[in-house]
Amino acid sequence: MKTDDKDREGGDSHGAIGAKLMEYALKVRKVFVTGGVDEKMAKDVVQQLHILASISDDPIYMFVNSPGGHVESGDMIFDAIRFITPKVIMIGSGSVASAGALIYAAADKENRYSLPNTRFLLHQPSGGIQGPASNIEIYRREIVRMKERLDRIFAEATGQTPEKISADTERDFWLNAEEAVQYGLVNKIIVSEREITLPGQ
């Protein structure tokens, strides 16, 4: 029983620390997109964005380090970034891959920054399904439509053509920070937050 009590106390302690960190992050208008992109993450991030937007129109800082995940969950965050009034200043860190890159691309280009050692991954959506041939064909068509939509999004974000995006992402398309700048995905590589130019400055 003592072990259980200690475990419970430890869990409560970690939860309290996490709550305090979240409270402070919201106070300084910072949102962290870390780990796999799924429904829970999307819900949490979108709620934070709307809370911050309701407080003021000051810029929001979003740090992205994600291996990707569900495209639809990435869409939810992408649309929220575009929906709210405050500008979102995006900082890529570590790995910005797949659905993580989709979220990153939601910010205006002048507000997209990268730390020096960040790697970016663009690729076509993938997935598997089992069932009747008719369902498989429907799923295949939806994957094609999703790919075309993502091609358009990344074309708009980078200045590349949808055709080039489509060709480049036929296989995993990795970019380091410098290459991401050349490709048009990143505006500027920074090593300090002092190098960020706030909207309107």
Curated annotation (Swiss-Prot):
Q: Does the keyword Glycoprotein apply?
A: no
Q: Which UniProt keywords apply?
A: Cytoplasm, Hydrolase, Protease, Serine protease
Per UniProt, subcellular location reads as:
Cytoplasm
**Which domain of life does this protein belong to?**
Bacteria
Please give the CDD domains that the UniProt record associates with this protein: S14_ClpP_2
The record's listing under PROSITE patterns reads: CLP_PROTEASE_HIS
Q: What's one GO MF term for it?
A: ATP-dependent peptidase activity
Active-site residues are S98, H123
Enzyme Commission number(s): 3.4.21.92
Q: Which GO terms describe its cellular component?
A: cytoplasm; endopeptidase Clp complex
Q: Per its UniProt record, what SUPFAM superfamilies does this chain match? A: ClpP/crotonase
- Function of this protein? Cleaves peptides in various proteins in a process that requires ATP hydrolysis. Has a chymotrypsin-like activity. Plays a major role in the degradation of misfolded proteins.
Under the heading NCBIfam families, the entry gives: PRK12553.1
From the Swiss-Prot or TrEMBL record, give the protein name.
ATP-dependent Clp protease proteolytic subunit 2
Tell me which species this is from.
Pseudomonas aeruginosa (strain ATCC 15692 / DSM 22644 / CIP 104116 / JCM 14847 / LMG 12228 / 1C / PRS 101 / PAO1)
Q: Which gene encodes it?
A: clpP2
